[in-house]
C-alpha cells in the first residue's frame, strides 16, 4: 500500500505498512495552532484504526520539529472570557497527546532542530524518540508565564525521573540531544543527514514483529506506567485558567510577540 494524504498543515505518507505523519508549517517552524492540532488528532486516529499499518513515524517539514504552541494565536485569546471556553481550549492539547499515546501501533518521533513546548510533548507521547545530533529539546512554558499543560507532566516524570523532569520543566532551557540521550528521553542520536534513514529502520524493526503481541505489550506498559495520569489530568486546565489571567502571562506573551525582554512581577 502506498498512499499520500495532504492537508494544509499535516501530511500523511503511507508506504507499505509504515505511516509517516508530517507536521507541515515550516514557515513558522511548525508552531502548533488550533487547526494543526485538530488535523493531527484526526490523522493520528485514522492511522491507529488502520489494521494494515504496523508502525508510525512522526516527522516534520523544515528545519525544526516544532517550536510548540503558536503564541501569536495564544496572544489573541481573551483571558477574561468564558472559563468554560478557556478549559476547552486547554483540553485540545490533552486530547492530542492522549490520541498519540493511544495509537495502537508503535510510534517513533524523529526530532530535528528545535522541539519545545507542545513539540516536545508530542515527542514524549510517542513510544520512542530519535534525534539528529544538533537537535535541542525543551519546555519553555515557564518563560512565558504558563504551566506545562496537556497532561504532559506525568509523561516527563515517567521518562526522566522526578529531579530531571523538574529541571527540564522548571528551567525552560533547551538541552542538546546528547545530554537528553544520557538522561533517557532520547533512544538514539544520529547525524543530521541520517535521521530519516534511522527513523525508517526503527519503524521497520517494529513493523516486522507480530502486531497483536506488540500492540498488547504497548498497551500494558502504558497502562502501568501512566496509571495515575488520569487522576491528575484536570490540574493542567485549572492551572492554565489561573496562569492565563495573570499579569505575568500577558507581559511574557506580549514580550515574545514584540520581541523584547519580559519583566514579570509575580502578579
Give the location of each predicted region:
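Conserved CoA-thioester-binding segment of acyl-CoA-metabolizing enzymes
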Residues: 1-61, 98
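Amphipathic alpha-helical segments at domain termini/boundaries
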Residues: 1-24, 173-207, 215-225, 252-267
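Short loop-to-helix capping motifs
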Residues: 25-26, 50, 209, 246, ...
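Catalytic-core regions built around general acid/base machinery
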Residues: 43, 92-103
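Glycine- (often His-adjacent) and acidic-residue-rich active-site loop
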Residues: 60-96, 115, 145, 227-228
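Crotonase-fold acyl-CoA enzyme core
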Residues: 98-212, 246, 251
Amino acid at each position: 500500500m502506498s498512499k499520500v494524504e495532504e492537508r494544509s498543515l499535516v501530511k500523511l505518507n503511507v508506504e507499505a505498512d509504515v505511516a509517516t505523519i508530517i507536521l507541515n508549517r515550516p514557515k513558522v517552524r511548525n508552531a502548533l495552532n488550533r487547526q494543526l492540532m485538530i488535523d493531527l488528532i484526526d490523522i493520528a486516529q485514522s492511522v491507529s484504526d488502520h489494521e494494515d499499518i504496523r508502525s508510525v513515524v512522526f516527522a516534520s517539514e523544515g528545519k525544526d520539529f516544532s517550536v510548540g504552541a503558536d503564541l501569536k494565536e495564544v496572544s489573541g485569546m481573551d483571558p477574561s472570557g468564558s472559563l468554560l471556553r478557556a478549559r476547552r481550549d486547554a483540553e485540545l492539547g490533552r486530547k492530542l497527546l492522549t490520541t498519540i499515546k493511544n495509537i495502537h501501533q508503535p510510534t517513533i518521533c524523529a526530532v530535528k532542530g528545535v522541539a519545545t513546548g507542545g513539540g516536545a510533548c508530542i515527542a514524549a507521547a510517542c513510544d520512542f524518540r530519535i534525534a539528529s545530533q544538533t537537535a535541542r529539546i525543551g519546555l519553555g512554558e515557564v518563560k512565558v508565564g504558563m504551566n506545562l499543560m496537556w497532561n504532559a507532566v506525568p509523561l516527563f516524570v515517567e521518562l526522566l525521573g522526578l529531579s530531571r523532569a523538574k529541571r527540564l520543566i522548571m528551567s525552560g532551557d533547551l538541552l542538546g540531544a546528547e545530554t537528553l540521550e544520557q538522561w533517557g528521553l532520547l533512544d538514539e542520536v544520529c547525524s543530521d543527514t541520517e535521521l530519516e534513514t534511522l527513523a525508517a529502520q526503527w519503524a521497520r524493526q517494529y513493523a516486522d514483529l507480530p502486531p497483536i503481541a506488540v500492540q498488547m505489550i504497548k498497551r500494558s506498559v502504558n497502562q502501568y506506567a501512566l496509571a495515575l495520569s488520569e487522576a491528575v489530568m484536570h490540574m493542567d486546565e485549572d492551572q492554565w485558567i489561573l496562569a492565563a489571567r495573570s499579569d505575568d502571562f500577558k507581559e511574557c506573551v506580549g514580550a515574545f510577540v514584540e520581541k523584547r525582554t519580559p519583566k514579570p512581577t509575580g502578579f
